[in-house]
């Protein structure tokens, strides 16, 4: 029987939430256990055989996260998960946790690390499981059979829970740093003893910098911080989001200040009255500070300019109309002998004829 569908997803969800708490306390794990209602995982209508098989698979899955290469926090969470699954199972007698002999040394080493780090709640949980005889020691991790398989199924390692191998941290441990500090202090004391001036050592003896150990310590701390940020990109993204929000707020305030300054400059510019020359004082336009008055003033200026253009164009238009009339008359005169229509008498000829008749009438009256 393989891993039941959904069981691995639920276990990884619980462990991932426990990892987000950044804690190894049993109280935090029990709170997540209650919120997810993980105690009801064995509830349901199952026969005894199915119940036993399901419990074995659940305990084997939790035991997988208790061993390397997973991080210390995930291993502690897996220990709490084993304790919860073992005590909430419904099998009678209880199914035990299958432990291979080759892994037991690693388990004892982890127990010692818990005690040294003073994580007594996790150490107590492990001791309680041992006293309850929850472990079943076997030669192999899985039950072997006579069936031959061409492809051996290997359990996939969850990368999120995996403890990345860091050669720098393996090389420079806390013990190595402490030993380097002792050697550096001894070296500085020996320089003072050898030199003539006890207060100041000779420059010829200073083969390394005085802050050599401090520089190495700072580099190691920076590497640890970079390693944490790489392992938990969510925390780094949150800090970056906070910085971006602060930068966005500062940019918005700068834009508001610029807009206010531009508005003040515009108001000052439009509040000043333009003084026209003496010849154009009758066309002077007053401008107010508001945008509406400035727009109306601009409209008035445009209207006055249009009127000036029309006045200038009027005499020129009259001259052009008179010229056009003369040209039309000349054209009619030239066309007279060619056309058979009646002659056209202009207003000037009518006036001359009328004046001629009046002149002849006045002569006749004088004669009489």
UniProtKB/Swiss-Prot annotation:
It is found in: Nucleus. The keyword Nucleus applies. The modification Phosphoserine is found at residues 289-290. Residues 224-257, 275-368 are annotated as: Disordered. Keywords: DNA-binding, Nucleus, Phosphoprotein, Transcription, Transcription regulation. GO terms for biological process: snRNA transcription by RNA polymerase II; snRNA transcription by RNA polymerase III. GO terms for cellular component: nucleolus; nucleoplasm; snRNA-activating protein complex. Residues 1-168 are annotated as: SNAPC3-binding. Residues 238-257 have a biased composition (Basic and acidic residues). InterPro entries: SNAPC1 (IPR019188). Transmembrane segments: none annotated. Part of the SNAPc complex required for the transcription of both RNA polymerase II and III small-nuclear RNA genes. Binds to the proximal sequence element (PSE), a non-TATA-box basal promoter element common to these 2 types of genes. Recruits TBP and BRF2 to the U6 snRNA TATA box. Part of the SNAPc complex composed of 5 subunits: SNAPC1, SNAPC2, SNAPC3, SNAPC4 and SNAPC5. SNAPC1 interacts with SNAPC3, SNAPC4 and TBP. This is snRNA-activating protein complex subunit 1. The lineage of its organism: Eukaryota, Metazoa, Chordata, Craniata, Vertebrata.
